A protein has these predicted regions:
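Active-site pre-lysine segment of PLP-dependent enzymes
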Residues: 1-2, 12-37, 42-91
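Hydrophobic residues in well-ordered beta-strands that form the structural core
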Residues: 7, 38-40, 120
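Active-site C-terminal subdomain of aminotransferase-like
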Residues: 74-75, 104-124
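Short beta-strand-to-turn element immediately C-terminal to the catalytic PLP-Schiff-base lysine
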Residues: 96-103
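Structural motif of enzymes handling amino- and sulfur-group chemistry
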Residues: 103, 120-135, 140-141
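Structural signature of PLP-dependent enzymes
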Residues: 109-114, 131-154
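Conserved glycine-rich beta-strand-loop-beta hairpin in the small C-terminal domain of fold type I
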Residues: 125, 129, 145-153, 163-171
Length: 171
């Protein structure tokens, strides 16, 4: 049986592995051949650790999005990217998130949301708008998480544990 939806996480939970553009493009091509919607959890995309020192300024790696033209060929058909501001903007209690992608799929989600009473409060929408316009606080959060991550890695490796695939996210 062919699935209706393929859900992917990149950065992955719990490994922190990041799917490269080439792999994501293959997933999209396969899904389109089989009429499968691809939904991608990209909530930790701003917490990409694949640079020498996340505390230093300068160019950094970014987690590729399902909606990147190099991945989707410029068409969002059959694709949904799910994004939360919980970690990057420290808005976990706000339940601040959004879905982007295929306009037809988004319209269906909006209808369900409207009739199910799942409204995002106005103040939360305003906070999201401010947060999405400000990259500086995201860099600050990345720095905080990066420092904590290094302390944890050192402690875990100090007792003989091995860390694998931890490229991004909180993992």
């Amino acid at each position: 049986t062919t699935p209706k939806v393929l859900w992917i996480n990149s950065p992955g939970n719990p490994t922190g592995a990041v799917l490269p553009v080439e792999h994501l493009a293959k997933v999209v091509a396969w899904a389109r051949r089989h009429g499968v919607v691809v939904a991608a959890d990209e909530c930790y995309a701003e917490l990409d650790w694949r640079q020498p020192d996340p505390r230093r300024p300068g160019p950094r790696h970014t987690t590729p999005s399902l909606l990147d033209p190099a991945v989707c060929g410029g068409s969002h058909e059959g694709l949904l990217a799910v994004y939360s501001l919980s970690k990057q903007s420290n808005l976990a209690g706000y339940r601040a998130a959004f879905v982007a992608g295929d306009p037809a799929l988004i319209a269906g989600l909006v209808e369900v949301r409207r009739h199910a009473g799942m409204m995002v409060p106005g103040p939360v929408q305003a906070a999201m708008t401010v947060a999405l316009r400000d990259d500086e606080h995201v860099a600050d959060q990345r720095l905080r998480y990066g420092v904590r991550r290094e302390i944890l890695i050192e402690a875990l490796e100090g007792v003989g544990l091995r860390i694998e695939h931890s490229e991004a996210g909180l993992y």
